[in-house]
């Protein structure tokens, strides 16, 4: 986790969702706009809140399945998006519907843009 600990007060718990790979229509280049050419995109996210007592049941936990379902159902259905930055902001807004969260990090990486191993990515770290 790459959060700057100096910005966090007290102890926190974190749920991470890693290596979610989707095929999305995203990009500004002509070849990225082709309807039959979806971009392979990886999403990694961390959601933090102040440390809670040990949970008595699942309802007291950060629901990573809610985040996963949103990414895997809503994003592929939304059609073409020019910028991964737009997707990152969208994820932050969705994650913060959980009012217990105090910090969210999302990193979106385009996996097949270049012919070599280079991978452009965009990251947001937002504190509430």
Residue ranges and their predicted role:
Residues 1-128:
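N-terminal, polar/charged subdomain of small-to-medium soluble alpha/beta proteins
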């Amino acid at each position: 986790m790459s959060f700057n600990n100096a910005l966090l007060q007290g102890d926190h718990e974190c749920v991470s969702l890693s290596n979610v790979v989707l095929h999305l229509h995203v990009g500004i280049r002509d070849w990225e706009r082709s309807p039959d050419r979806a971009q392979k995109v990886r999403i990694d996210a961390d959601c933090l809140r102040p440390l809670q007592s040990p949970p008595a049941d699942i309802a007291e936990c950060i629901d990573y399945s809610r985040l996963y379902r949103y990414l895997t159902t809503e994003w592929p259905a939304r059609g073409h998006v020019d910028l991964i930055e737009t997707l990152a902001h969208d994820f932050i807004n969705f994650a913060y519907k959980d009012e217990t969260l105090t910090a969210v990090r999302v990193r979106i990486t385009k996996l097949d843009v270049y012919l070599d191993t280079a991978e452009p990515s965009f990251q947001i770290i937002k504190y509430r």
